[in-house]
Structures are given as structure tokens and as C-alpha cells.
UniProtKB/Swiss-Prot annotation:
Pathway(s) per entry: Amino-acid degradation; L-phenylalanine degradation; acetoacetate and fumarate from L-phenylalanine: step 1/6
Record's keyword annotation contains Iron: yes
UniProt-listed Enzyme Commission number(s): 1.14.16.1
Keywords, alphabetical: Iron, Metal-binding, Monooxygenase, Oxidoreductase, Phenylalanine catabolism
Entry cofactors: Fe(2+)
UniProt-recorded name of the protein: Phenylalanine-4-hydroxylase
Top enzyme class: oxidoreductase
Source domain of life: Bacteria
Protein residues bound to Fe cation: H144, H149, E189
Length: 289
């Protein structure tokens, strides 16, 4: 398996259309069993890997993540010496926005993914990367899902957007879902937002990766464009490269406002208009959005 940065590969596990054809058996990881009380029996090696992952990333995000994410981290109060248990996370999410996390296998289908979001349940694969894949991983693991995404689910506007997104996706056709996937990619996974005159990060695909966090916030290579829903829906992406473009919200309330619009009408218009020219070189057997 090629060594591609974690943050640009997570789409294989959730939102890449190509993944719909892949068997769960193709992943080398298997989610750990969850008890009737929602507890997972993590071992000491896994606790040690979690400690190294979270302590490293805490330093990277503290000046680069948006305030809503940092506030959410404070609410979650994730332990650094051990992996958190699902009920600990659910108590906070339920209190703040009515969400919960739902344990799932390493790879799930589009149908399952959208159904969970529509029910205010965020899918969390109950496995953690091995030490030899500390920085490179194909599937979205427990660290990516919990550290990358759960903090933002404490924010009402983000939570409302994600809920409506799930409802729309649950009813969408496969082609419509491919356009919706681009919306998710450039918001929930790789979204940026303006905050007091600075560009900050709220996308979990960025915030769970030190390399992508630095690249998205400081590199002069990628474009950073004002968020435009029609542009977003028509922008191709690849999961095996650092992103050539990010879309920047003026503020997080725009996510809620977007959730109140007729998003599917915008999807249909984007389908009629077609995709924009890609900002990356073609690749044989590429996995593109």
C-alpha cells in the first residue's frame, strides 16, 4: 500500500463513490466489539498510540483550528492517557446538540452512512491504526472520527447542517450522492472558515492530520476560495494528494443557512452544468470525487 497522507485518504472509508464497489473484506482492519454498555476493550498498545496521536495533534491545532472546534474539544475533554469510551462522548454530544456516535465496521455503505447522519448518529469505526501506520492509513479510524469530527458536532450550526445533509443523502440517487459527496468533502472534511480576519480550520480531515493542518493553514500552494455552493458541488477532488483548493466560509452560521436552502435543486443545477476542470493531473485508476 502506498504511503499517502492520512487526511487525503479518509474518503475511501466513507464518501468516495468508488468505495461503494469495495468489499468490507478488503480492509485489513476490523472494528473491535462494543459491549451492551457501549464500552470497547482497548489494549495498552492502543492506549499508547492514542496518547501519541492526540498529544502531537493538540499542539498543531491549538492556533489553527476555529474556536468552535477548540470549544468542542474542551467540552469533550478527551483523555490523553487512554482512549475515550463511547458513552463519555455521547453524554457531551447529546447534551449539546442531540447527537451521538454510533460504532460501525471499518467500511460502511453510502446507505448506512446517510441513514446514520439522518438519525443524528455519527459513524465511528471502533479500531485504531497500528503503530506502523501512524501517519498513513486507508480507512477512517477511531482517532480520525473522534478527534477530527466530534468536537464540531457540539456546535449547533454544524450539527444541523450534518443532520440535513444525512436526510438529503438518504433519499438521493447514486449520481446525486456523488455531487453531495463533494459538498461533504469541502465542508465537513476539508472546510475552512474566516474568524476575526484569519482563516481557521473546521474540517475533520484536516484537523486529524498534522501534515494537512499545516498545509491547509500555511502553505502557499493550494487555492483558498470564498465558499460558493455551486462551485463546491462542481469541483472534482482526489483523495490521494494534498488538496489543491479549499473553500472558506465567512462564518459557521453559513452552514445552518445552507441547510435551510433547497440543496437538491442546487445539486440538480450542478449536474446540468457539469464539473469544473480539475486542478490536478489525471492519474491512472485514480479515486476522484
Amino acid at each position: 500500500m502506498s504511503k499517502i497522507p492520512l487526511a487525503v485518504r479518509i474518503g475511501l472509508g466513507r464518501l468516495n463513490v468508488t468505495n461503494l464497489l469495495r468489499s468490507r473484506a478488503m480492509t485489513q482492519y476490523h472494528s473491535k466489539p462494543v459491549s451492551e454498555h457501549g464500552h470497547i476493550d482497548w489494549d495498552q498498545d492502543e492506549h499508547a498510540v492514542w496518547h501519541e496521536l492526540i498529544t502531537r495533534q493538540q499542539e498543531v491545532v491549538k492556533t489553527r483550528a476555529c474556536q468552535a472546534y477548540l470549544d468542542g474539544l474542551n467540552m469533550l475533554n478527551l483523555p490523553t492517557d487512554r482512549l475515550p469510551q463511547l458513552p463519555e462522548i455521547n453524554r457531551v454530544l447529546q447534551r449539546e446538540t442531540g447527537w451521538q456516535v454510533e460504532p460501525v465496521p471499518a467500511l460502511i455503505s453510502f446507505d448506512r452512512f446517510f441513514a446514520l447522519l439522518a438519525d443524528k448518529k455519527f459513524p465511528v469505526a471502533t479500531f485504531l491504526r497500528r503503530r506502523e501506520e501512524f501517519d498513513y492509513l486507508q480507512e477512517p479510524d477511531f482517532f480520525h472520527e473522534v478527534y477530527g469530527h466530534c468536537a464540531m458536532l457540539t456546535h449547533p450550526d454544524f450539527a444541523a447542517f450534518t443532520h440535513v445533509y444525512g436526510q438529503l443523502g438518504a433519499k438521493a440517487t447514486p449520481k446525486e450522492r456523488s455531487y453531495l459527496a463533494r459538498l461533504y468533502w469541502f465542508t465537513v472534511e476539508f472546510g475552512l472558515v474566516q474568524e476575526q480576519g484569519q482563516t481557521k480550520i473546521y474540517g475533520g480531515g484536516i484537523l486529524s492530520s498534522p501534515g494537512e493542518t499545516l498545509y491547509a493553514s500555511e502553505s502557499t500552494i493550494p487555492k483558498r476560495e470564498p465558499f460558493d455552493i455551486m462551485q463546491v458541488l462542481r469541483t472534482p477532488y482526489r483523495i490521494d494528494i494534498m488538496q489543491p483548493i479549499y473553500y472558506v466560509l465567512p462564518d459557521l452560521s453559513q452552514l445552518y443557512q445552507l441547510s435551510q436552502r433547497d440543496v437538491m435543486a442546487l445539486v440538480w443545477q450542478a449536474m446540468q452544468d457539469g464539473l469544473l476542470p480539475p486542478l490536478f493531473q489525471p492519474k491512472e485508476q485514480q479515486h476522484a470525487g
